Amino acid sequence: MGGDGDGFAIGGGHVPHAARRNVDITYLLFDNGIYGLTKGQTSPLSAVGFRTPTSPYDNPDRPLNPLLMLLSHGASWVGQAYAGRPDHLHKMITQAMAHRGFSYLHILSPCVTFDKTHRTYANLGMQVRDLPADHDPSDRLAAMREAMHDDTPALGLYFREERPTLGDALDGLVEKSGGELPG
């Protein structure tokens, strides 16, 4: 588990490698678009023009697109949920944890302390939509196209593929070596 600031700033360098190696973990990222623990500083996912105590004249930076990033890094399971829909969120967490391999669940979660205007429960509740019923979660390019619609975030399973995990690959190397370490 992590937040948008930690996950896509300080800790962002580890995510691509865990995804591409298909490490068997579930990464739940809570995105409130702000560093709530540092008194409302903008995060890598804060919107352009967002005002905070540390950016009183608007945030000039474009936000990253985490779904698109994880899809391009090779994550084998990518989904998005919203804290304002707890039943759907529970279903998505359960699916992510059941997936064998790297699963990433992006959770839109308002910061009720430092964002009383932009990303509130009321605003997000009107913006989010479900992925289209005919969306094919085995099609990475279709998932990327959906991820590009960050002005109307879609909830649901964007992408899923079954492939060997890092643990499987390492087991294969041990088997290939006859269980012997070189040296």
Pin down the residues of each PLM region.
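Conserved thiamine diphosphate
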Residues: 43-96
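Short, surface-exposed, charged loop/turn segments at secondary-structure junctions
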Residues: 41-50, 86, 93-98, 102, ...
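Histidine- and/or cysteine-centered catalytic micro-motif in compact active-site loops
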Residues: 83-84, 108-110
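Short catalytic-loop micro-motif centered on adjacent basic/acidic residues
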Residues: 1-2, 77-82, 104
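Short acidic, glycine/serine/threonine-rich loops at helix termini
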Residues: 10-14, 20, 37-42, 115-120, ...
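Short coil/turn connectors at secondary-structure junctions
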Residues: 20-26, 30, 74-75, 99-102, ...
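Thiamine diphosphate
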Residues: 1-36
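Flexible, low-complexity linker and terminal segments
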Residues: 110-183
